[in-house]
Amino acid sequence: MPNAAEIVPDYLLIGHITHDVTPYGPHLGGTVSFAAHTAAAFGLKVALLTSAAPDEPLMERLPDSVMVVNIPAEHTTTFENIYTPDGRVQYMYHRARTLEVSMLPPAWRNARQVHFAPVAYEVDPAFADVFADTPLCVTPQGWMREREADGRVRQVHWSAAGQVLPRADLTVLSVEDIRHDPGLEAEFAALAPVMVMTRAEKGGTVYVNGEPRDYDAYPAEQVDPTGAGDVFATALHIVRHQLDDLWRALDVAARLAANSVTRRGFAGAPTPDEVAQALAAVGAPGKR
């Protein structure tokens, strides 16, 4: 049986899993975690390049089918959100290793789709050169933050945006990601061939070569919004590649994101049946 590092993935994720400190105990977090669950529901061969403590028990909460290369670190990237009368304060207590091109298994360079999903400025922008000819999704929130000496996370200017965004087939971010500088919406839309700015239950805006077009979200009874944006971005990237149709892919992604907020944690990731139903709703066959 071949080693996972020798298998060409359908969907390659690059970014840190995270240990999220919550009042209910530790939770597995990170965009790659929700994205892995989503891509697996599409029946794809999913691979993850990450860095975490070698004995991190939270890794067991990833789907069993996901092929993982974990670059061992002293600690897993660890976040905690503290809610105050003045709003949320985020702390990053630990950060695992920076992910570099040399860490990538050679076979994974031939992945059919790639998703850069940094949460702690951990993905080397040089990966964009490696995947210049591969359908690439970028969810850039983790490149727009840094950790201060006391662990507090602050928003910063993303200096490599001009290197990465023009190479990406799809860029997805939320209004929360740019709350510190709303002008970044226009700046990034001018760099990215296709960019989606999500606005939670209000839908969002799609920019194609800088031209905006709004879309609506599907209504849903919200229970837990965690991970819905990751479900949306991953589904949009996958279905756009399958159908070569941005607008039908957007509809599928919006349906799955609406389902996601009605359940807690990874239960919000789509099921294979939900994927099939969403594809059928836009007249597309399932890709199981």
What are these regions (language model features)?
Residues 63-71, 113, 133-138, 152, ...:
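Active-site regions of enzymes building and remodeling cell-envelope glycoconjugates
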Residues 28-32, 152-159, 185-189, 215-218:
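Charged helix-capping and loop-helix junction motifs
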Residues 27-42:
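Short catalytic helix/loop segments, enriched in acidic residues and glycine
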Residues 37, 79-82, 203-207:
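Short beta-strand scaffold segments in enzyme catalytic cores
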Residues 2-7, 184-288:
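Conserved phosphate-binding/catalytic region of the ribokinase-like
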Residues 113-186, 202:
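Conserved beta-alpha-beta core of the PfkB/ribokinase-like small-molecule kinase fold
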Residues 15-17, 231:
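Active-site metal-binding loops of divalent metal-dependent hydrolases
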Residues 4-11, 19-24, 41-122, 127-137, ...:
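Conserved N-terminal subdomain of the carbohydrate kinase-like
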